[in-house]
C-alpha cells in the first residue's frame, strides 16, 4: 500500500477504535449468532457472553442499567426477559432476547424516534 490514512473522530480517537460498519442483514446475522452462542453451554463465545452478563457494571442509565464487554446486559429498556443490547450512533440498536429467541434490529441514523416506547411494544 503506497498511501496510508488514519482517520480520527471528533474526540480524537482513531476511527477504527469506535466504529463498526455493517448492513442491517449483517447486524441481524450477528444477533442470531449471539443468541445461539449465549445459550450454548459448551461454547467459548457463549462463556464469554455469560461472563459479560454476570460481571457487568452499573451505568446509571434507565435504558441500559448494566454494561459489560460491548453489551448492555440487564433489562434494556425495561424488558422483562433475559436480554442484551448493543447500541450505536443515532440509536442504532440490536436487542437480543435470548430467553424467547427474539431479535430486534433497528438500523437508524436518526435519534428522534422513541426506543423506550418502541422496544417494549415490539418485544413484549
Please place each PLM-identified region on the residue numbering:
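A conserved catalytic-loop motif detector
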Residues: 32, 40-57
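Short, gly/Ser/Thr-rich active-site loops of penicillin-recognizing serine hydrolases
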Residues: 114-124
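Active-site helix/loop module of the DD-peptidase/beta-lactamase fold
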Residues: 1-22
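Active-site-proximal alpha-helical segments within enzyme catalytic domains
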Residues: 18-40, 92-109
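Stable alpha-helical elements in mature extracytoplasmic
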Residues: 23-27, 45-48, 118
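Active-site Gly/Thr loop motif
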Residues: 2-8, 50-106, 111
Amino acid at each position: 500500500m503506497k498511501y496510508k490514512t488514519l482517520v480520527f473522530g471528533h474526540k480524537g480517537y482513531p476511527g477504527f477504535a469506535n466504529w463498526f460498519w455493517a448492513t442491517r442483514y449483517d447486524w441481524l446475522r450477528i444477533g442470531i449468532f449471539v443468541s445461539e452462542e449465549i445459550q450454548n453451554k459448551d461454547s467459548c463465545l457463549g462463556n464469554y457472553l455469560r461472563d459479560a452478563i454476570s460481571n457487568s457494571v452499573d451505568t446509571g442509565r434507565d435504558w441500559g442499567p448494566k454494561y459489560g464487554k460491548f453489551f448492555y446486559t440487564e433489562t434494556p429498556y425495561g424488558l422483562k426477559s433475559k436480554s442484551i443490547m448493543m447500541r450505536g450512533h443515532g440509536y442504532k440498536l440490536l436487542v437480543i432476547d435470548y430467553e424467547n429467541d427474539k431479535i430486534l434490529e433497528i438500523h437508524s441514523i436518526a435519534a428522534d424516534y422513541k426506543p423506550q416506547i418502541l422496544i417494549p411494544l415490539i418485544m413484549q
